[in-house]
């Protein structure tokens, strides 16, 4: 019995010892120290946008030197299952320029997770806007960050080239390329030099740039390494290719890069229905004025809500001027004024700024039909009178005599009387009879453009002059002739006396 009891006790003791060992191992695994390579930044503790890092891309900071045999570097161990940290994934340098201050280089060669915040710009320069498109008259700002500019005596020059230089810039500029040891191409105008006292005196400054520019059109602001080029007003003259050259004071062309500034200006739309005379076809003109660039302008015409499809009725022309381009479109109706009611014209203009954006505007106007006036001319004893009935207010007469192309001056007297039609009046003009001309023309002036010339011709023989008046004129003519002869005689006598006295004086001196 004793050996059996002893064996049973040994078995029970072994089972207890084994259970204690298992429990101890579990406690050691759960309570042993956990080695981590970094701390997790919560969203509530994320730095502001002005500081490096963000909640979306936490910065991994080592807290201890891990044992390479027990832990892998840059690997984090979660402490709370509800909010596990994300393991940062290595990212390559982005090709597109960032839009804010780049993050500093992470510690321990750890690359932060890719997020919406920009990273450190590659290359010696980074510009936030390489190809801005701005509205006419607006203000443009281009921000560039120059690497290592605070470690040297930095000098920056900016040159402007027109959009279509002649000869063109060779080779063609690449907006993403950074050039080295390349001087500014010829044909440019200098808009900025951070060291104006070192500028070549033969350099041509752009309008609104350089020392003494009033008002200044260009400015560069901001502390290094970031510089902001500000163009006060974008116009066809200020748009173009801008070449930024920088380097040391003694080597300002160590680096160079291109920035393009483009302008757009939507057209303004006006519709002018033509005033037509009875018997003339209706017309209307639509003008898309002062737009840029010269992208296609499309006109759709409607006459009394019916679209005009016949291309023979529409004439469209484009004109270039310093402020841009203007397109004029004129539609001619098949209907004639006086035979049908006045027509209502609608012009729909579409201008494509680019392949995606366009402007569309409408304008409507009613055509005006004017009655054809009746012009009469009456000759009196001393005056000739010309009358035109029912003409628009503001219309008057101009008189022409014979073949003289200039109007008769200081002789026409104009009066207006009311007419039965609203907005119309009867015009009467009086001109004294001429003793030198027999042909008279009275012409109506002041009609809207497009109205044909309206005039009346008349003939009248010059009346004989008054005998008394003729005698007076002849007497004046004879008096003038007598005065001329007398003056000539006095001059002759004076000359003779002078010659005689001169000869006598010479003879005395000889003696």
UniProtKB/Swiss-Prot annotation:
Q: Which residues are listed as membrane-spanning? A: 481-497
Q: Where in the cell is it found?
A: Virion membrane
Using the UniProt annotation, give all residue ranges assigned to the region (Heparin-binding domain): 137-151
Those parts of the protein on the Cytoplasmic side are: 498-511
- Which region is the signal sequence? 1-24
What does the record's miscellaneous section state? There are seven external glycoproteins in HSV-1 and 2: gH, gB, gC, gG, gD, gI, and gE.
Indicate the quaternary assembly: Interacts with host complement component C3b; this interaction inhibits host immune response by disregulating complement cascade.
User: What's the protein name?
Assistant: Envelope glycoprotein C
The upper taxonomy is: Viruses, Duplodnaviria, Heunggongvirae, Peploviricota, Herviviricetes
């Amino acid at each position: 019995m004793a050996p059996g009891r002893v064996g049973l006790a040994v078995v029970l003791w072994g089972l207890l010892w084994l259970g204690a060992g298992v429990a101890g191992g579990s406690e050691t695994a759960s309570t042993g120290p956990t080695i981590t390579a970094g701390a997790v930044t919560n969203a509530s503790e994320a730095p502001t946008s002005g500081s490096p890092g963000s909640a979306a891309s936490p910065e991994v900071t080592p807290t201890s030197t891990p044992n390479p045999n027990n832990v892998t570097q840059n690997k984090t161990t979660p402490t709370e299952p509800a909010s596990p940290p994300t393991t940062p994934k290595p990212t390559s340098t982005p090709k597109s320029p960032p839009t804010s201050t780049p993050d500093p280089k992470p510690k321990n060669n750890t690359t932060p997770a890719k997020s919406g915040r920009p990273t450190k710009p590659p290359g010696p320069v980074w510009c936030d806007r390489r190809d801005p498109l701005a509205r006419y008259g607006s203000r443009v700002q281009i921000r560039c960050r120059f690497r290592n500019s605070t470690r040297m005596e930095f000098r920056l020059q900016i040159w402007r080239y027109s959009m279509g230089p002649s000869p063109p810039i060779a080779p063609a500029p690449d907006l993403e390329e950074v050039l080295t040891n390349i001087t500014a191409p010829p044909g440019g105008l200098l808009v900025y030099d951070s060291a104006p006292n070192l500028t070549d005196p033969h350099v041509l400054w752009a309008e609104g740039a350089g020392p003494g520019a009033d008002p200044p059109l260009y400015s560069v602001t901001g502390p290094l390494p970031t510089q902001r080029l500000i163009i006060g007003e974008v116009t066809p003259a200020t748009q173009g290719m801008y070449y930024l050259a920088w380097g040391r004071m003694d080597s300002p062309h160590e680096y160079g890069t291109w920035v393009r500034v483009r302008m757009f200006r939507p057209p303004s739309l006006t519709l002018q229905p033509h005033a037509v005379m009875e018997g003339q076809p209706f017309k209307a003109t639509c003008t898309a004025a002062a737009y840029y660039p010269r992208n296609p302008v499309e006109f759709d015409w409607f006459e009394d809500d019916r679209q005009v499809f016949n291309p023979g009725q529409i004439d469209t022309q484009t004109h270039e001027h310093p402020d841009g381009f203007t397109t004029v479109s004129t539609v001619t109706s098949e209907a004639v004024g006086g035979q049908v009611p006045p027509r209502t014209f609608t012009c729909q203009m579409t201008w494509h700024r680019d392949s995606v954006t366009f402007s569309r505007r409408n304008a409507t106007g009613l055509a005006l039909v004017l009655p054809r006036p009746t012009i009469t001319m009456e000759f009196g004893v001393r005056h000739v009178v010309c009358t035109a009935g029912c003409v628009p207010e503001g219309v008057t007469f101009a008189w022409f005599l014979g073949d003289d192309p200039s109007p008769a001056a200081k002789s026409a007297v104009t009066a207006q009387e009311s007419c039965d039609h609203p907005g119309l009046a009867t015009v009467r003009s009086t001109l004294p009879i001429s003793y030198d001309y027999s042909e008279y023309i009275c012409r109506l002036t002041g009609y809207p453009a497009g109205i044909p010339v309206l005039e009346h011709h008349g003939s009248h023989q010059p009346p004989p002059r008054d005998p008394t008046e003729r005698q007076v004129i002849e007497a004046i003519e004879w008096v003038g002739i007598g005065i001329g002869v007398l003056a000539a005689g006095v001059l002759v006598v004076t000359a003779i006396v002078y010659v005689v006295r001169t000869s006598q004086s010479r003879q005395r001196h000889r003696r």
